[in-house]
Amino acid sequence: MTMVSSAIPMVDDDPARHRFRVHRDAMTSPEIFREEADRIFGHSWLYVGHESEVASPGDYVRRPVGGRPLFMVRGAKTGQVHVFHNTCTHRGAVVCRHKSGNAKVFQCFYHAWTFDSEGNLAGVPGREAYGENLDFSALSLRPVARMESYRGFVFASFDENVTDLATYLAGAREYLDLVIDSADSKMEVVKGTNEYCIQANWKLLAENSIDGYHAVSTHDTYFKYLIALGTNLKGGVQGTARDLGNGHAVLEYAAPWGRPIAKWEPLFGEDAREEIAELRAGLVARHGEERASRMADTNRNLLIYPNLVVNDIMAVTVRTFMPSAPDRMDVTAWEIAPRDELAQLRQRRLDSFLTFLGPAGFATPDDIEALESCQLGYRSGGVEWNDISRGMDRAPEANDEAQMRAFWRRWQQQMGDAACKEMR
C-alpha cells in the first residue's frame, strides 16, 4: 500500500473550528532555527539600542543584533548616530572590542587599520605599499543596510528593501508614545544591564511576554507578597489584548499594585503619596484626564516583532532575546527612565524593576523555569501540537491568546514553506 504524505504549515489556524495550533517542531528543529536566521532576523527591523546610550560625539555601544556583531556610535563630525558591522574591511577582525565607551577612532588590533567615528578609513600602516589606484574610500566601515530611529529607539535591518520603520511599527507606535510622553523630560537608558540565558526556544519568551493567562498561577508568590503589603487584588486584573499589525501585539491591563510614576499604593510607602500625586497632576496638565489616566493606571506588555519587549509596568524595561540554538536564547534587559526625574523616584523605579523583572526578582525566575520546563517537555515527542486557541470566539481579554496568535501568523508568513511539516 502506498503511503501518501503532504506538507502542512506548522501554524494551524482554523477559525471555523476555533482552533489555533503550533507544531512543536517550530521550537525544536535545527532546520527551523537555521531558516529563521535569514527569513526572520534577516528581513525584519531589529532593536539596536537607545540614542541616549550614545549621547555625546564618539560614544559607542557594541552588541550582537540578529546574531551579527554590530556597534552603534555617534559621529564626532556630524553628530549623527551610525550602526556599523563590527568587522574590519581589511581582513575581518572586529574593530570595536569594548562593550561601551567613547572613542575618537576605532583601530583594528590585527593590522592597525583605523576608522573614525563616522566610519571613514582614517589610517593604514604602510599605505605607500598599496597601488595608487586603490580606492581607500571604498574600504570604510560598512553600515547596516537600513537604520532608522523612532523617538530615540534605534532599529536596524539587514534588508535594504524593508518597509520604513514607522510603517513597520504600525500600532506599536501608540504604545511607545505612551511610554515616552509620560515623562516630562527626555528618556534615557539607566546605566547597567541584565544579561542571562534561557535554555528554551526564543519564541517561547515572545509568547510569555504578552501572556496574561499565566500570571496568577506562575507568579502566585508575587501576588501573595503584594497582598501582604496591603494591595487590594480582590477585583482581579482586568484588561485587553490587541493585535497591532506586522506581528506586534500588546497586553494592556489595570495596575492594582500601582505604578511608581503616578499611581500610589501602600507598597510605595506613605512618604511617597504626595510626591506621586504631584506626578499624576503633571500628567493631567500635559495630556488631559483621559490619556493621563491611561498612563498612570494601566500597565502594558508590548511585543515588537520579532524579539523586542517593552514592559511598561512597575518600571519601564526594554528587553531583547536572540536565539543561539533551537533550545537556547540570550536575553538582555535595560531600564529606561526620564532623564531629570527625582533621585527618590529613580530609586523607587529601580527597586520595582529589580523586585519583579530582574533576573533574581519575583517574575523572571518563575518565567525561566516555566519556559525551560516546556522545552524539556517537548523532548518526550508524545504530543505534536501546542494549543493557542483561548478566546478565539470572543473579543480578546487580557488572559486570552489573540496577541500570541498575531505573533505566530506573522512568523508563518515570513517562514513560508520552510515552516511546513510532512504529515502522513
Task: Identify the residue ranges that each predicted region occupies.
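Generic structural signal for secondary-structure transition and capping sites
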Residues: 41-45, 93, 214
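C-terminal catalytic domain of Rieske-type non-heme iron oxygenases
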Residues: 73-75, 80, 145-148, 153-424
